[in-house]
Curated annotation (Swiss-Prot):
It comes from Clostridium acetobutylicum (strain ATCC 824 / DSM 792 / JCM 1419 / IAM 19013 / LMG 5710 / NBRC 13948 / NRRL B-527 / VKM B-1787 / 2291 / W). This is Beta-ketoacyl-[acyl-carrier-protein] synthase III. Its EC number is 2.3.1.180. InterPro entries: ACP_syn_III_C (IPR013747), ACP_syn_III_N (IPR013751), FabH (IPR004655), Thiolase-like (IPR016039). It holds the Pfam family ACP_syn_III. Catalyzes the condensation reaction of fatty acid synthesis by the addition to an acyl acceptor of two carbons from malonyl-ACP. Catalyzes the first condensation reaction which initiates fatty acid synthesis and may therefore play a role in governing the total rate of fatty acid production. Possesses both acetoacetyl-ACP synthase and acetyl transacylase activities. Its substrate specificity determines the biosynthesis of branched-chain and/or straight-chain of fatty acids.
Length: 325
């Protein structure tokens, strides 16, 4: 089986909308400061819903869109940096919530590039013939790991989830992937878990599990790899950039996307943008965007799409997709 198709999409965001004006009551900021630097106008924040809750709701919508039964899914991969717990995995919790009792399940952490890594991994499993139908979810409740006193980070992120169902098919819907990592930049975007504390160690106290970021370094890295990754994946696909109908970037910052578009010689009309409504939802941004495009009827049969992401690790990745629905 060499052909894999996306047969359905779904997404879910919490009901609570937090505007830039709301953020100005928490930290020293303003709508003008946030929107001019990031393009973000508002974000969704979870109230008593955890990462698996958002992921399961997005998954159920993708299942409905695919017109399949949960029991037909035999693989679930969840991309997340904000799991409910160290164990069990979010994927196992999602499996139970949606009734996909026949699926093997695991989580994958590649930060904001996680969904691309997960989608590529799932497609490779299907191409080997080991699995037939996979659910790939990007889901985050980043609000629980934000430093709400750091205006440089807390204004950027939001909570949300997106999902796709992929299956072996007659047409090749996942044409090519290009993935990369650079651990030397690990401290540029960082969220510690816990110190090594046990009866035999000298370590005292817990690490602060909050996101920290070197914005200047992340910006430079993001523009660089976004441009190089898009060029490489298109070239490796045997296509030209003119063949691409849409580029769906990780929705982190409008300035990053604008700089990359200029370096690629492309109009911003080529890029699908929804970060103004959701902020940076890390591993959820790309599947959330794909589902929104699907629901709006923007994706016509045969359309070619490049998805491109970048994030902590450092990690980056891009894929060329063909819409076959």
């Amino acid at each position: 089986m060499n052909s894999v198709e996306i047969i359905g999409t779904g997404s879910y965001v919490p009901e609570k909308i937090v505007t830039n004006e709301d953020m100005s009551k928490i930290v020293d900021t303003s709508d003008e400061w946030i929107s001019s630097r990031t393009g973000i106008k508002e974000r969704r924040i979870s109230i008593n819903e955890n990462t698996s809750d958002l992921g399961a709701k997005a998954a159920l919508r993708a299942i409905e869109d695919s017109n399949i039964k949960p029991e037909e899914i035999d693989l679930i991969i969840v991309a997340t940096t904000s799991p409910d717990s160290y164990t069990p995995s979010v994927a196992c919790i999602v499996q139970e919530k949606i009734g996909a009792k026949n699926a093997a399940c695991f989580d994958l952490n590649a930060a904001c590039t996680g969904f691309i890594f997960a989608l590529n991994t799932a497609s490779q499993f299907i191409k080997t013939g080991e699995y037939k139908t996979a659910l790939v979810v990007g889901t985050e409740v980043l609000s629980k790991i934000l430093d709400w006193q750091d205006r440089g980070t807390c204004v950027l992120f939001g909570d949300g989830a997106g999902a796709v169902i992929i299956r072996g098919g007659d047409e090749n819907g996942i044409i090519k992937a290009c993935l990369g990592s650079d651990g030397t930049g690990k401290d540029f975007l960082h969220c510690p878990a816990t110190n090594v504390i046990n009866p035999f160690s000298d370590e005292k106290g817990l690490a602060s599990s909050k996101i920290s970021m070197n914005g200047r370094e992340v910006f430079k890295f993001a523009v660089k790899v976004m441009v190089s990754s898009v060029k490489k994946v298109i070239e490796d696909s045997g296509l030209n950039i003119e063949d691409i109908d849409y580029i769906v970037p990780h929705q982190a910052n409008i300035r990053i996307i604008e700089f990359a578009a200029k370096k690629l010689g492309l109009s911003m009309d080529k890029f699908f943008i929804n970060l103004q409504n959701y902020g940076n939802t890390s591993g959820a941004t790309i599947p959330l965007a794909i589902d929104e495009m699907n629901k709006k009827g923007l994706l016509k049969r045969g359309a070619k799409i490049v998805v491109v992401g970048f994030g902590g690790g450092l990690t980056w990745g891009s894929m060329v997709l063909k819409w076959t629905k």
